[in-house]
Amino acid sequence: MATNADPAPTKKPRNSRKALKQKNELVETPPSPVSVKGKSAKSFEQDLMEMQTMLEKMKIEKDKTEELLKEKDEILRKKEEELETRDAEQEKLKVELKKLQKMKEFKPNMTFACGQSSLTQAEQEKANKKKKKDCPETKRPSSSYVLWCKDQWTEVKKENPEADFKETSNILGAKWKSLSAEDKKPYEERYQVEKEAYLQVIAKEKREKEAMKLLEDDQKQRTAMELLDQYLNFVQEAEQDNKKKNKKEKDPLKPKHPVSAFLVYANERRAALREENKSVVEVAKITGEEWKNLSDKKKAPYEKVAKKNKETYLQAMEEYKRTKEEEALSQKKEEEELLKLHKQEALQMLKKKEKTDNLIKKEKATKKKKNENVDPNKPKKPASSYFLFSKDERKKLTEERPGTNNATVTALISLKWKELSEEEKQVYNGKAAKLMEAYKKEVEAYNKKSAATTSS
């Protein structure tokens, strides 16, 4: 086997000593132990200072985190309280909803009398018109002039075939005026007979209507009373149901029921457990288990506090009951006083009413006496210009339009008076002025005569 041959020795260069010398010059001299000690002390102080600043920063951060945690705990606690109150409100709403759902509706059991009219006013009027059409006795009788016109109409139309309704009416009107009293008599008698029959029927109907109205009013009153009784019974039943189902509203002044020994202990422990971020349910469970495991000796101070609370509660309740009784008595007295006051006011009002009624009666009596004592010979005040015109026109209109009601005639007269010119009105104004002059003279004469009689 062939072995590797050792390398041939190389010759050192001549300038190697110079290079070593330069190398040695470049290498640093080792530091002295004193200088090393000083440097290490300085670096330790710096490290210590840095550590202190770091610790301070960490403390500040810790405080900040603690504050943030506290804030978060407070927010969580508030949210829990809000949820609790919301749950309580929801429960209340559910209870109220159940109450409303269970609440009865007022359904009256009414049997309306057959006498009570279910028709509306318009339907009633329609029925009355139909009744008048079917029954000729209920129709208003035609006047003697209209009866005569009916008899003469065909004859006049034969004589004047080209005449229209107005012309025919005018011809008949002229003929009626020229008729003697004997010729008019049979038509007037016929009209009187029909009028009497009509008045009898109307009087009977009116009496029947009045009787039916009285009956209807009586039935309505009875129905209203029955309805009121039913409603009052319904209200009473509803109140009784509410008394059974619902508790009375709490009085804010009423002393609160004392807490038990367990609740005293639980209230004491709650704050500490809440600091540990325990929920309300967890707090309740923990305090319950702790209370069970407590010995009688440890329970004793809490039971002592509970007993003391109960004693103070009983004393407060006695005081509360006493004040309530006093309030009830004072309220009763106030109500009695108020009732007396109302009675007094009512009596005063009644006296005033009686007084005014008596005054009205006296006034009426004095007026009646004055009217009785009026001298029949005393001149009467003359008619006005409009009244004179109205008198003339009424006569004309009744002849032209027989059977027209009084209200329509009055309205027509008023319209005609407005349509008159000043010259036309002057005729009636002159007549009224003459009558007024004559009236004044008569009054003067009357006054002189009455003065002479009184002096004698």
Curated annotation (Swiss-Prot):
Compositionally skewed regions (Basic and acidic residues) per UniProt: 240-254, 354-363
Region (Disordered): 1-42, 117-142, 238-258, 349-389
UniProt keyword Nucleus, yes or no: yes
One matching Pfam family: HMG_box
DNA-binding region coordinates: 138-206, 255-321, 379-447
Keywords: DNA-binding, Nucleus, Repeat
A cellular component term, taken from the record's GO annotations: nucleus
InterPro entries according to UniProt: HMG_box_dom, HMG_box_dom_sf, HMGB6/HMGB13
Highest taxon listed in the record's lineage: Eukaryota
Annotated PROSITE patterns: HMG_BOX_2
Example of a GO MF term: DNA binding
Localization (cell): Nucleus
Start-end of Basic residues biased regions: 11-21
Primary residence: nucleus
PANTHER family attached to this UniProt entry: HIGH MOBILITY GROUP B PROTEIN 13 (PTHR46912), HIGH MOBILITY GROUP B PROTEIN 6 (PTHR46912:SF2)
Name assigned to this protein: High mobility group B protein 6
Source species taxonomy: Eukaryota, Viridiplantae, Streptophyta, Embryophyta, Tracheophyta
